């Protein structure tokens, strides 16, 4: 289990207060689908995923990316109980959707890249370290049902 210090929690919460979940979520999920094309199999019902441009402009990818990032934002309210908070989502992804839990780690790492791209100088080493721990905690929580 990943534990963030009070300072790390403050870093993530401060950055997150500036995050536009629609923009960042859409870009993060879109990049996941482009960079790791095998993840597209979970989203075939989203329509055209034939090119990077089609993926990044796909309204269903954008909407789901926002939904995913909103869940990450909800995680910030429960940093000390991510597993409990995301138990149902973990169960859904494991038992019904059969998502490879490695995809959660991949998405988290892509999210960190997207945050760095958007927040540049504000995305210091300390912020990056805190964000990496946060997304690792989210990935662990979402993969918990698999263990």
Swiss-Prot record:
Any GO MF annotation of the entry: heme binding
The GO biological-process annotations, alphabetized, read as: hydrogen peroxide catabolic process
Superkingdom of origin:
Eukaryota
Query: Per UniProt, where does heme b bind?
Result: 64, 93
Q: Where does the Globin domain start and stop, copy by copy? A: 3-147
| Keywords (A to Z) from UniProt | Heme, Iron, Metal-binding, Oxygen transport, Transport
Q: Which Pfam families match?
A: Globin
Gene Ontology cellular component terms for the protein in this record: blood microparticle; haptoglobin-hemoglobin complex; hemoglobin complex
Q: In which tissues is this gene expressed?
A: Red blood cells.
Determine if Iron is one of this entry's keywords. yes
Family stated for the protein in its record: Belongs to the globin family.
Q: How does it assemble?
A: Heterotetramer of two delta chains and two alpha chains.
- The name this protein goes by in its record: Hemoglobin subunit deltaH
